[in-house]
Each structure stands twice: as C-alpha cells, then as structure tokens.
UniProtKB/Swiss-Prot annotation:
Species this protein is from: Cyanidium caldarium
Upper taxonomic lineage: Eukaryota, Rhodophyta, Bangiophyceae, Cyanidiales, Cyanidiaceae
Domain of life: Eukaryota
UniProt keyword Flavoprotein present: no
InterPro entries cross-referenced by the UniProt entry: Ribosomal_uS2, Ribosomal_uS2_bac/mit/plastid, Ribosomal_uS2_CS, Ribosomal_uS2_flav_dom_sf
CDD domains listed in its UniProt record: RPS2
Main subcellular localisation: plastid
Molecular function GO labels: structural constituent of ribosome
Protein name, per record: Small ribosomal subunit protein uS2c
C-alpha cells in the first residue's frame, strides 16, 4: 500500500529538529528551512518507505526474520504492537548488550526464562516454598523486562528495524560487526549512513512512528501471508493489514 503525502503531513513527519542540531549528512533529505527548523523532504520519505517495504517483502519471502527496535517512549508501544501483528521479534526497553555479538549468552538467558516460567506453572502442585516462589517471580519479571519480545528467537535476526538510530548506538555497532542489514526511521539530527535503508521522518512524533512502522509491519505480514509462514491465528490481524 502506497504511502501518501497527506498521511505523512497529518502525522507531522516533515518536522525536523532546529537547524542548530542537524547532522550535515542528512542534507540530501532536507526540503527547506522554516523558522529555524529543518523541514524533511517527504517525497524522499515516501521513496525510502517503498524501498524498505520491497526489501522486507523480498527477504521475508525467503524466510528471513526481523527484529523491531524502539526503546524511546514514543516508539515503545508501537514497536511491540506491530512486531506482534506480523509475528516478529522486538526490543522496546533497554537493548540487552551482546544480543547479536554475544548470542550464546543471550540464548542461555532465554532458556533460563523459559525454565523459570515452566516451573512457575507447576507451583500449584506445591513444589516450591513461598520464599522461593517470590524469588522466582522477581527473576522472571527481571528477565521478561528485556527479553519478553525475543522469546522463541532461535538465532540472531536477519534484519533489524530501528526507530531513532541515534539512540541505538550499541545496536548499530553490533549490526555492523555481523553485517546485519538495518532499516532506520531517523530525524535531521541523525546520520543516515548509520543504517542501510534510511527513512527520513520526525522520529519524535508518535503518529509518524506509528504510520511508518505499521507500513513496514504490513509488508512483512503480506509476505508471510503469501508464503503461509504464520504459526497460528494468522488471519486474526488480516483486517488490520489489508485495509
């Protein structure tokens, strides 16, 4: 589904940062300056959304897995919702350092979380004391805070989508070390060369983040639907994505 100029304008996707905070490498994506604010060229935003969606469709059809990353307040809920809709993974709290570059350790943490949650389900049999139960619940809560969105991940993701890469420097660094392609929604204060597919937009606007992330999620959803890649209940989100 094509992105329209009016959609982006309504979402304030064109409003960048003040000219004093810009990154000169963002220049190709700037339309004009107005009252000390850089205005983003939304035609290029539309083009880049299209590039990102085509890339995702192609890769997902080939079985590639995607991780959505958005830890800022404006992105957190959107990232979780859209990742779940297309049955992919997400990180919306602090990035667990080494998630990509030290995957064996992260995998052990995921296994630990799985075992603790399985043990918790058996508590009704009286297999643990109240003190042990309280300690176990605290540990589960702690692990879930950062790992809940990557349960079921068997290996590092093949593609990462980031909201505001300037806040996700560790993620970017790990991706670059492992040559994992990245798609980034980024504002005028960011370096577009920090990601493989930059999408210029106001990354402080919840509406803009919501609009663009949902477009990316929809492209993943449709690619999976074509290939019958959904695990279960694949049609429950169909209406959301094919409107």
């Amino acid at each position: 589904m094509e992105t329209s100029l009016s959609e982006l304008l309504d979402a304030s996707a064109h409003i960048g940062h003040s000219t004093s905070k810009w990154n000169p490498k963002f220049f190709p994506f700037i339309h004009m300056t107005k009252k000390g604010i850089h205005i983003i060229d939304l035609i290029k935003t539309i083009q880049q959304i299209s590039v990102a969606c085509m890339f995702l469709k192609k890769e997902v059809r080939n079985g590639k897995r995607v991780l959505f990353v958005g830890t800022k307040n404006q992105a957190s809920k959107v990232v979780e919702r859209e990742a779940k809709k297309c049955q992919e993974f997400y990180i919306n709290q602090r990035w667990p350092g080494g998630l990509l570059t030290n995957w064996p350790t992260i995998k052990l943490s995921l296994k630990k979380l799985q075992l603790l949650e399985e043990k918790e389900k058996l508590d009704h049999l009286g297999s643990t004391s109240k003190k042990e139960e309280a300690s176990m619940k605290r540990e589960i809560q702690k692990l879930n805070k950062y790992l809940n969105g990557i349960k079921g991940m068997k290996k590092p993701p093949d593609i990462i989508i980031l909201v505001d890469p300037s806040r996700e420097k560790t993620t970017i660094s790990e991706c670059q070390k492992l040559n994992i392609p990245t798609i980034g929604i980024l504002d005028t204060n960011c370096n577009p060369k920090s990601v493989n597919v930059p999408i210029p937009a106001n990354d402080d606007s919840i509406k803009a983040i919501d609009l663009i992330v949902s477009k990316l999620s929809t492209s993943i959803f449709k690619a999976k639907l074509e290939n019958n890649q959904f695990i279960e209940n694949s049609t429950e989100n169909l209406n959301e994505h094919v409107k």
